[in-house]
From Swiss-Prot:
Domain of life: Eukaryota
Gene Ontology cellular-component terms listed: endoplasmic reticulum membrane
PANTHER family, per database record: AT29763P-RELATED (PTHR43908), DNAJ HOMOLOG SUBFAMILY C MEMBER 18 (PTHR43908:SF2)
SMART domains: DnaJ
Keyword Phosphoprotein tagged: no
Protein name in the entry: DnaJ homolog subfamily C member 18
Keyword Magnesium included in the entry's annotation: no
CDD domains: DnaJ
Transmembrane segments: 227-247
Domain J residue range list: 82-146
Length: 357
């Protein structure tokens, strides 16, 4: 029994020593959890790893030596009130000037080379300043809403505010490796707020996507209406044209018999004996001078019509003659010769009557 108790005491003492050395060796830490693979969990795991790296670096700072110049440099960074002062550039600095300033300061304040108190926070501030100012959109927002506050605190407390809503999604070490590891990106570094705002960012993005989808659906539903609006001017013009034709007064005569319009009574002009047709009310409306003027108009219209018909007859006769000669077709030649130019004969008669009159 004594031997068993001694073994239990030794086991208990070993367990206590393990807890002191490692803290929670068998169970997981209270604030840890298995990442589920979602964006927020992966982000939290990444930042926890980054915080552990900063803690190890800060522990090394207390045991290393530093120069007075390095300490003054850290103090200068802490006193800066905006990102331009941190990098030591003007507000209209170009991308090349920003890169040059960052490279110089990053090498100077990297924790491996600068062990002054606060060098880690200064290095992080330098990286965050460059990451913001190198992005055109973030820089524009920073110039408009910046100059609020710059607070250097312990990363573990998660209250470092290198300008609210202007924290980089890339760590200072990753940014440093980008520059000095031979993999400088061709584009700008994209920025987001801290991890606590990621859910808000994705909610805003999904809300924006839903809004765009709803807008597209509205556009689809409005497509027939939009098409109708576009065709409306054409419809108005056609409608006006039809109404105008319907409301326009019918001419008092016709060169041809048209029972549907009432032109069933045959007449002839007094001068050239041109036939035309009128309705039953014609005699009441036209007498004397008005009738003579109207008949002049009728004769002119009739001559124009006969001239057009004569030209068509000559054109047809000429085409048949040419085809007969081209194909040496006797049948076409005979048809061309037998074709009578009746309207041309009428035209000649009318011209003779006009000359005689």
């Amino acid at each position: 029994m004594a031997t068993t108790l001694g073994s239990g005491e030794r086991w208990t003492q070993a367990y206590i020593d393990a807890i002191r050395r490692n803290k929670y060796p068998e169970d997981k830490r209270p604030d840890s959890h298995d990442p589920c693979g979602c964006c927020n969990c992966m982000k939290a795991q990444k930042e926890k790893k980054s915080e552990n790296e900063w803690n190890q670096t800060r522990q090394g700072e207390g045991n290393a030596t530093y120069t007075e110049e390095q300490l003054r440099g850290v103090q200068r960074i802490k006193k800066c009130r905006n990102y331009y002062d941190i990098l030591g550039v003007s507000h209209n600095a170009s991308d090349e000037e920003l890169k040059k300033a960052y490279k110089k300061l990053a090498l100077k304040f990297h924790p491996d080379k600068n062990c002054a108190p606060g060098a880690t926070e200064a290095f992080k501030a330098i990286g965050n300043a460059f990451a913001v100012l190198s992005n055109p959109d973030k820089r524009l927002r920073y110039d408009e809403y910046g100059d609020e506050q710059v607070t250097f605190t312990v990363p573990r407390a998660r209250s470092y505010h290198y300008y609210k809503d202007f924290e980089a999604d890339i760590s200072p070490e990753e940014l440093f490796n980008v520059f000095f590891g031979g993999h400088f990106p061709s584009g700008n570094i994209h920025m987001f707020s801290n991890v606590t705002d990621d859910s808000q960012y994705y909610r805003r993005r999904h809300r924006h996507e839903r809004t765009q989808t709803h807008k597209r659906e509205e556009d689809k539903s409005q497509t027939p209406y939009s098409a109708f609006v576009q065709l409306l001017p054409v419809l108005v013009i056609v409608t006006i044209s039809v109404i105008t034709q319907l409301l326009a007064a019918n001419p008092p005569y016709s060169l041809f018999y048209k029972s549907t319009l009432g032109y069933t009574i045959s007449r002839e002009t007094q001068n050239l004996q041109v036939p035309y047709f009128v309705d039953k009310n014609f005699d009441k409306a036209y007498r004397g001078a008005s009738l003579r003027d109207l008949e002049k108009t009728i004769e002119k219209d009739y001559i124009d019509y006969i001239q057009t018909s004569c030209w068509k007859e000559k054109q047809q006769k000429s085409e048949l003659t040419n085809l007969a000669g081209l194909y040496r077709d006797e049948r076409l030649r005979q048809k061309a010769e037998s074709l009578k130019l009746e309207n041309c004969a009428k035209l000649s008669k009318l011209i003779g009557l006009r000359r005689a009159g």
